[in-house]
């Protein structure tokens, strides 16, 4: 007796019109995550995962490439409007926002959510090179 063929169900992509782009720009890398309004991740990309290694990873161009890759990953969800949350002091802050704008998203607002301590932990000592 032959088994009936099992049909693999096609994964249905939900359509999202508004999204939130979380940009984490550290001194060493830039991480771009695009979520829906509830915070469910739709796609992400990093400068390191985009092929940049070492000191090239911490450049504005690497952050731009990461933003373009993240934008390509979430195009199939139908996102048109993006709210941008930027965290961190890194070099990829502005170039990431420009790349998302150039990718065809309408940026509704930009918020800086960098955590600022109320004199919390002691910072690391200064480097002596």
From Swiss-Prot:
PROSITE patterns: RIBOSOMAL_S11. It comes from the Bacteria. GO terms for biological process: translation. This is Small ribosomal subunit protein uS11. GO terms for molecular function: rRNA binding; structural constituent of ribosome. Gene3D superfamilies: Ribosomal protein S11. Part of the 30S ribosomal subunit. Interacts with proteins S7 and S18. Binds to IF-3.
């Amino acid at each position: 007796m032959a088994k009936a063929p099992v049909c693999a169900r096609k994964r249905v992509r939900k359509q999202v019109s508004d999204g939130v782009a979380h940009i984490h720009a550290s001194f060493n890398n830039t991480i771009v995550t695009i979520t829906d309004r509830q915070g469910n991740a739709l796609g992400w990309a990093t400068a390191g995962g985009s092929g940049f290694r070492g000191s090239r990873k911490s450049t504005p161009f690497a952050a731009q490439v990461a933003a373009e890759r993240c934008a390509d990953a979430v195009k199939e969800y139908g996102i048109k409007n993006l709210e941008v949350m930027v965290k961190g002091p890194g070099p990829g802050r502005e170039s990431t926002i420009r790349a998302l704008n150039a990718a065809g998203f309408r940026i509704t607002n930009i918020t800086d959510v960098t955590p600022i301590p109320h004199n919390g932990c002691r910072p690391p000592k200064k480097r002596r090179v």
